[in-house]
């Protein structure tokens, strides 16, 4: 099963751009990433040509670790395709960059609430929720901007730095 380029939607994808979380054929990769100096900095990895031979009966790629189950995640640091079980076992407490394979949908809620450490998805959600809570707690009616860019609550004992 060939993975199609997300730009031209015609040619076989040869490159995974980790910054864009997209797969591209070689001509589209050159066209997109040579456009300006910022795009040239994107981290990209080549897709393996022989990956089609290591697939399940449904055509999905196999996990590189167990070689038994369907792979759902790509780990950038390990350069490996992982099933859910192997991903949990290996990446429970580290900060490797992992990408969900195209066509797979997941919830933003963790199934395990009592884990000792959280995945990057959970911590990002928590950080976003914390910022929203902080902003709604100190609304514009209750705050005024100081000269240094600080948010100063009308109660002088509360000072928040951006």
UniProtKB/Swiss-Prot annotation:
| Annotated positions binding Zn(2+) 1 | 5, 8, 28, 33
**Which biological processes are named by the entry's GO terms?**
regulation of DNA-templated transcription
Name one cellular component (GO) term: nucleus
Keywords tagged on the record: Metal-binding, Nucleus, Repeat, Transcription, Transcription regulation, Zinc, Zinc-finger
Matching InterPro entries: B-box_zinc_finger (IPR051979), CONSTANS-like_Bbox1 (IPR049808), Znf_B-box (IPR000315)
A Pfam entry, by short name: zf-B_box
Q: Which residues bind Zn(2+) 2?
A: 63, 66, 86, 91
- Top-rank taxon: Eukaryota
Q: Which GO terms describe its molecular function?
A: DNA-binding transcription factor activity; zinc ion binding
Compartment list: Nucleus
Location of region: Disordered: 137-162
CDD domains, per database record: Bbox1_BBX-like
Annotated B box-type zinc fingers sit at: 5-47, 63-101
Q: Does the keyword Ion transport apply?
A: no
Primary role: Probable transcription factor that may be involved in seedling photomorphogenesis.
Q: Which PANTHER family match?
A: B-BOX ZINC FINGER PROTEIN 22, B-BOX ZINC FINGER PROTEIN 23
Q: What is this protein called?
A: B-box zinc finger protein 23
């Amino acid at each position: 099963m060939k993975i199609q380029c997300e730009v031209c939607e015609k040619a076989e994808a040869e490159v995974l751009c980790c910054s864009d979380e997209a797969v591209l054929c070689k001509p589209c990769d050159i066209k997109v990433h040579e456009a300006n100096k910022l795009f040239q900095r994107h981290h990209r990895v080549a897709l393996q040509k022989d990956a089609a031979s290591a697939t399940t009966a449904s055509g999905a790629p196999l996990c590189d670790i167990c070689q038994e189950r369907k792979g759902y995640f790509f780990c950038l640091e390990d350069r490996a395709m992982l099933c859910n079980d192997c991903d949990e076992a290996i990446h429970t407490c580290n900060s490797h960059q992992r990408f969900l394979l195209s066509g797979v949908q997941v919830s933003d809620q963790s199934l395990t609430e009592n884990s000792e450490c959280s995945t990057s998805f959970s911590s990002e959600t928590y950080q976003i929720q914390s910022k929203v809570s902080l902003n709604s707690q100190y609304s514009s009616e209750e705050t005024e901007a100081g000269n240094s860019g600080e948010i100063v609550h009308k109660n002088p004992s509360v000072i928040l730095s951006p």
